[in-house]
Amino acid sequence: MKRLNPALFSSVKMDWATPQAFFDDLDAEFHFTLDPCASAGNAKCGKFHTIADNGLEQDWAGETVFCNPPYGRAIYDWVFKCWRESRKPGTTVVLLIPARTDTRYFHEFIYHRACEIRFIRGRLRFGDGTAPAPFPSMVVVF
């Protein structure tokens, strides 16, 4: 019997590096200026925040943000931050997260508040791309 990836049910793995081609397609549409959830080695934009900078504490006003946050327990805080920052003038936030429509954050900040929700067909191949993610994904545009 095939075992399921434990990351599907826990916060064991929180950092899922965005597939470059997937990001490039979104960037061609939105022209991102800020990546608030980056490491020095995987930043998708010239302007970025690392864990040391704590993107949750930074101001995103006036930016076009690509946010692929850690998928652990703090995801609620990241979704709230994305929604809150998007309300600032000249700020657009595009959020890549697991498609978990049963969560509190989905109903409080995404459903009926997002400009657009795009469910990704199939499973993204994060990181080195050798295996698909153990969860479906969605792109949320605020």
Regions found by a protein language model. Give the residues of each.
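Class I S-adenosyl-L-methionine-dependent methyltransferase catalytic core
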Residues: M1-F142
